Every structure is written in structure tokens, then in C-alpha cells.
Amino acid sequence: MLENKLGLTSSAELAREEERISKKKAAMLFENHILDNLESGKFSTLQTIHKYLFDEIYDFAGKLRTVNIAKGNFRFAPLMYIESALKNIDEMPQSNFDEIIEKYVEMNIAHPFREGNGRSTRIWLDHMLKTEIGKVIDWSKVDKEDYLLAMERSPIRDIEIKYVLKNALTDEIDSREVYTKGIDHSYYYEGYTAFKADEL
């Protein structure tokens, strides 16, 4: 299990505390308008999100990972290429839905952090969509299996993830309910279901 600032040695306890603390921080991102003045689609903004969510739990919050990581048979960007990959992602266009999702897929392949990539990157994606096209994703309408399968295939074929996410777009960009339900759903994709964001 990961070393943590909480001194926890049980992975079940760590998972519970990680969910409780970072979900509360995710709600505060919205409540305190922390993202409003950050540049959309930049790695520096993703770093800010990740650090804000996980700083009370992990020393590596907001910092580039120092190990190679994989999920199943898929290896994320090797360490030696990660910095150049992130520079390229920063420069990718983001003027329409397709470009934004292509950028999101590349950031997922980069997987820049040791832990917490999916949860922080989905917030980063919504920030980009909100800023650039005045929409966000209603994640409560995105089926877990459809999403995970589409993301697994996205490095080779991104048409599926575009389809899945386009069908869940909403213009309720300032709705607290859409945001907090979305956080709960985002955490559910990763197996975190002990707490509700609007009750923390």
C-alpha cells in the first residue's frame, strides 16, 4: 500500500480516509470557486487540482510520479517520456468537444501521478469543457462499464469515449447537484462508494 501522511497501515482504512478527505476537498473546489481563475487544459491546472484533493493524504500530491505504472496490460507513459508528453498535451488544441476529449485521452495515457489520476483528470476535463464550450459532463449519466471499456480502448480508438461522453453533456455548468453527483460517480468508477460528496 502507499505511504501516507495519516500513518495508516491498513489499505481498507486508507481507502476510506482517502475517499472521505479528497471527496470533501473536491466539493470545496466547487464551493470556493478555486478553478475559476486557472487556465483550462494545462498540466499546471491538473497539478493544482491533484494537490488540492490529496495534499492531506500523500506527499506526492501534485507531483510527477517517479515510477512506471500500468493497469492490466496497458502501460502508461514511461517516465523518460512523461515531461515531453505533458508539454505536447499543453499545446494540443481544445476549441471543440472532439479536441477536448482527444486532449483528455492523451492526459490519461500520460497518467502523471502515482495515484488519483482518474479522479483529478475528470475534474480537469469538466473545467476545460466548461471554459471552452459552456458544457460539463453529467457523470451520473455515464455507465461505469461503458466508460471504463471506452477509456481502455481510447489510446487506439477514441470514437467510443467521445460517444459515451457526448451523450452525457449538459449546460448546467453551475449546478452544485450535477457537480457533487458527478464527483460521487467519478469515485464510484474507482471503487470508492462509502461517502456522498454533499454530505461531507
Predicted features and spans:
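FIC/Doc superfamily catalytic core
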Residues: 1-200
